[in-house]
Amino acid sequence: MDGAGEKRVRAKGSREVDWISNLPETLLCQVLFYLPTKDVVKSSVLSSRWRNLWKYVPGFNLSYCDFHVRNTFSYDHNTFLRFVDSFMGFNSQSCLQSFRLEYDSSGYGEPKLALIRRWINSVVSRKVKYLGVLDDSCDNYEFEMPPTLYTCETLVYLTLDGLSLASPKFVSLPSLKELHLSIVKFADHMALETLISQCPVLENLNINRSFCDDFEFTCVRSQSLLSFTHVADTDEMLNEDLVVAIDAPKLKYLRLSDHRIASFILNDLASLVEADIDTVFNLICKKMFNPNDLNKRNMIRDFLVGISSIKTLIIASSTLEVIYDYSRCEPLPLFRNLSSLRVDFYGYKWEMLPIFLESCPNLKSLVVGSANYREKEGINILSVPRGFLSSLEYVKIERPLKGEAMEMKLVSYLLENSTILKKLTLCLDDSIKKEESVILKELNTIPRLSSACQVVIL
């Protein structure tokens, strides 16, 4: 603290009012609660009133990154561990609202790992509500969470990153509502299934799967779950046939982003409202969609039927390509409730889009994201029957247009086939900003099925 600030805190005769120090201690502790713990401890030098206040803050946020060795790119891990260990001894009988610990266990060895286990056991006994443990050791999985974690009755929020989880003999997490598991190594597939099934009020589940997590079958079964995210790094060197089954009758939001999973089995998702899908059902490593593979076709059909009740959908072009290939064998199910659609293109041809739009009879809003348009011979999107975009009202093409032929074909298709389109929003690339008048002139020559349509250029 600078001299002026220190004078405001300590001077009794000053006209300036130190309104912060005049706050009740309970409120001051809540203010300190939102600061990194190392900064909270520093507040003890402000005045005699602040000297011991940090000991009563109801939450710890401890990170080895706060112990940077000056003029180097390294951290003082030993000082960090000593600091945390001594810190945990203060007011050890009080209840904790939150505890966040970030460390790097590379080279720690058993004595140091035992320290971390002791800290976890301590915060569990102090009835912690919000717990986050992050190991930045680059997938070494040296640290395994102690079994006391599985029976913490007060825990409401839990996030684990870079850790190992044993297969628990007994789980009871009656208060847990939100669970985030990132790059976590499970002892077996039952470890995850048991953990989820014994969280009776779990509402939000977020799983970022590890590259070494190769269980053939993973089941997410929950009667209370409202939101589920399943993400994995796309690694096309892996050629695994993995299955994920989801049984969550109250689920409202679903995000799937994993190209390795061969089959997503969706059971009873009638409550689903919103989905974000980026999967190719393991059609990677030069594996192509095979029309004669009836098992794959049945799985894709069941998957599409499983999400057909949604109102909002974000879908990757890679997924759309699989759906397009499937549609040449069987008709797509109708997405009668779908009113908002976003398609993100990453180097795939957008000509697949109209086939999917045919299955969305009540679509009102369409956003075409980062598309990479490429000329393609032999493709005629205007062969799609006119008027099937009978409900579409708003379209936005976010990728900056460069005036290329395929871009203008997309714009023409939308204008010529949308019965009640109210607004088409386009973005121009900076390289052709000076040619905006030329683009506008070309747009004005395109017939519009909807006379009320307004074209806006950003």
Curated annotation (Swiss-Prot):
Organismal lineage: Eukaryota, Viridiplantae, Streptophyta, Embryophyta, Tracheophyta
First and last residues of every LRR repeat: 152-183, 184-209, 231-258, 302-327, 345-370
Pfam families: F-box, FBD, LRR_At5g56370
PROSITE patterns noted in UniProt: FBOX
Coiled coil, from the record: none
Domain spans labelled F-box: 17-67
Keyword set, alphabetical order: Leucine-rich repeat, Repeat
SMART domains, per the entry: FBD, FBOX
Domain FBD: 376-428
Protein name, per record: F-box/FBD/LRR-repeat protein At1g78750
Lineage top rank: taxon: Eukaryota
